Amino acid sequence: MKIKWNSEQIPKMNVKNNKDVTFLTYPAYEEMNWLVHGFSTRFGGVSRGIYSSMNLSFTRGDDESCVKENYRRISDAMGFDMNSIVTSDQTHTNNVRKVTEKDRGKGIVIPRDYTDTDGMITNVPGLVLATFYADCVPLYFADPVNHAIELSHSGWRGTVQKIGAVTIEKMSEEYGSNPKDLKVAIGPSICQECYEVSEDVIEEFEKVFDKKYRNRLFYRKENGKYQLNLWMANKIIFLEAGIPEENISMPNLCTCCNPEFLFSHRASHGKRGNLGAFLGIRS
């Protein structure tokens, strides 16, 4: 299958295939051998129909046994134990939760006992954080000095609430992370050319982003709608929080441009499964 990349940016994400499961990785994160990480695609699972085939959502109507088998396969392919996963409870907040050993397996093999969690941080070896997508923006964070990690889910609401900056502050508070040391990545998600929004959404961005950024964030069309750039918005948030530009990996891969390769809510009109972002510290 031909993948549509959104730029000629080098390096692109790596497309991996292991044990008949296709997933994506970041070159910058592969250089940190203390990490395990990846981003799933639609390929390598057992789900059928609109969920075909690597659906990672238990809540969209897919057969639970298929979803569990998909988790077993993606975990095996990426190189970690399925029972070590800790999942988010995404409700478009900027809430970031510290994950500890007692959370191991929550959302996969045991029920979650927390809600409204769009970001998770940890420094516990052997745990793997997981967040879920079908156009919204995955944010990866790694601190190579303190060996701490974080994953955040940032749709337009999370971006307006600057969950990226909240995450960096939380990592600093909990683990002493310095923004200058962090290696961050923006994951596959909807690109500006695919993301049409109404004026009320743009008004929310105008409230929290300086005027000097507006030409980089959105433009107005003749129909009164706007095209919004969530990738650039999150990059600006990172830069303003003190992340060096060379430490930011951009996605250059749009979910909506690649609906046969990645799940996209917009491209499928809501008839879809979920992709997964995974990030863990090796034991």
What kind of region is each of these model predictions?
Residues 1-283:
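Active-site microenvironment for binding and transforming phosphate-containing groups
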